[in-house]
Amino acid sequence: MSTAVTPILLFTNWPFYVDKRLFAYLYRIKTDPKYPIVDLEYIKNKANELASENDQFQAYLREMDSNQLDKLVYSLSEDISPKISCTSCGNCCKSLMVNIDEDEANRLSEHLGKTRADFDDAYISKGESGRMVINSIPCHFLVENSCSVYEYRFAGCREFPAFHVPDFNKRLFTTYMHYDRCPIIFNVIETLKEELGFEKSK
C-alpha cells in the first residue's frame, strides 16, 4: 500500500515583506558579544565605529515627540538596566564629575567619622558659586570597581544615567558623553535604534 506524500513548497513567487529590524536583531545576536553587551573594550571600539551614525541619530531624535521618546527610552531602560551590574562595572565612577549638596556631604562625612571640615578638605572642590563637586576622577570612593560608600552615594550617582528623567532629547549631548563607557547607555541607545527602525543615511 502506497502512501501519498504532499510536497511542501519552500519557495514561491508570491510577494512577501520582511521586517528588516528582525534581521538586524538576529545579526546582532550572531556577531556581537552576549547581549546585553557589557564588554567595555568592545563598547569603546564600537562607539568610535558608530560616531557618524550617532551624529545622525541624535539629529533624528531631536525631531521626535519628546513625550513619546521619553516613554520609549524609559521602557527600554527598565528592561535593560536590571541585566547589567553597575556594582561590578564602576566605569562611570572613573569619568563622572559628581555634584554634591550639603545634606549629602553631611551624611557621608558622619558615616566616615570625619568632621565636615576634614571631609571637605579631603574630598570636595568648591566653586565661587558654592557649588561642590568630588575633587578626584576616578572617584575617591571607587575601590576595585565598586563603590565603597554605595548606601551613601550621591544623588548624581543614584540617578545616572537618568533615563527616567523627562526631556531625554534635550540631554543627548551629556548622554552621548558616556555612550562609549556606560554599558546601560550603549545598550539602550542601540536598542532604541532598532525599535525606531533607524538607518544611517549614506
For each predicted feature, which ranges?
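Short loop/turn segments that flank or connect secondary-structure elements
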Residues: 19-202
